[in-house]
């Protein structure tokens, strides 16, 4: 495999990670706007590579073990008052090893248990349906916004394409009557 191929694969992975990160950021911003408690914001899947939580700081791996060591239970099990008392933020921001996805973990939205319900007023399921619709569609909105920004950027800067060049002229063809040498650049489509 050539270096160019490896570089292209790296660019694809970074681009995919950016797309997912912005998509999840849309859900995250909308959840915060709706007043929904967000326990985690992650880019990537699998084990945690780096994590940051207010009150704990940057950690290699999840901050959960440090929170439990320091306060006796996980931050996701603490009330808002307990988080404030301990100086912890409600959200753990993490970068994970596999750049194939991402997620926002909201209180009352358990993907593994779709029938789970939380009675907390800041949970996803207690949020009015209109706000939940905004939260669900915010990821798609961010993807559309990114597409618009990229298109505008491409049209402003421009994209260079190689000029069409005649490679070979077949003798006694209509082209041979008008074009005399190989390598001629086409100027118009006529």
Language-model segment annotations:
Residues 13-17, 136, 140, 144, ...:
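Alpha-helical transmembrane spans of integral membrane proteins, capturing the lipid-embedded, hydrophobic core
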Residues 1-9, 13, 129-133, 137:
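Hydrophobic, aromatic-rich alpha-helical transmembrane segments
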Residues 2-3, 61-88, 110-130, 142-190:
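PDZ peptide-recognition modules
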């Amino acid at each position: 495999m050539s270096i160019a191929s490896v570089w292209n694969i790296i660019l694809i992975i970074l681009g995919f990670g950016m797309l997912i990160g912005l998509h999840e950021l849309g859900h995250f911003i909308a959840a915060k706007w709706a007043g929904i408690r967000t326990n985690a914001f992650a880019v990537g899947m699998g084990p945690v590579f780096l994590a940051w939580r207010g009150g704990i700081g940057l950690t290699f791996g999840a901050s959960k073990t440090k929170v439990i060591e320091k306060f006796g239970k996980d931050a996701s099990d603490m009330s808002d008052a307990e988080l404030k008392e301990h100086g912890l933020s409600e959200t753990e921001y993490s970068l994970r090893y596999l750049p194939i996805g991402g997620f926002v973990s909201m209180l009352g939205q358990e993907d593994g248990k779709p029938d789970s319900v939380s009675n907390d007023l800041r949970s996803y399921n207690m949020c009015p349906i209109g706000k939940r619709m905004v939260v669900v569609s915010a990821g798609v909105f961010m993807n559309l916004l990114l597409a618009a920004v990229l298109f505008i950027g491409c049209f402003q800067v421009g994209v260079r394409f190689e000029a069409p060049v005649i490679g070979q002229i077949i003798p006694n063809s209509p082209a041979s009557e008008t074009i005399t040498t190989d390598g001629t650049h086409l100027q118009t489509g006529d």
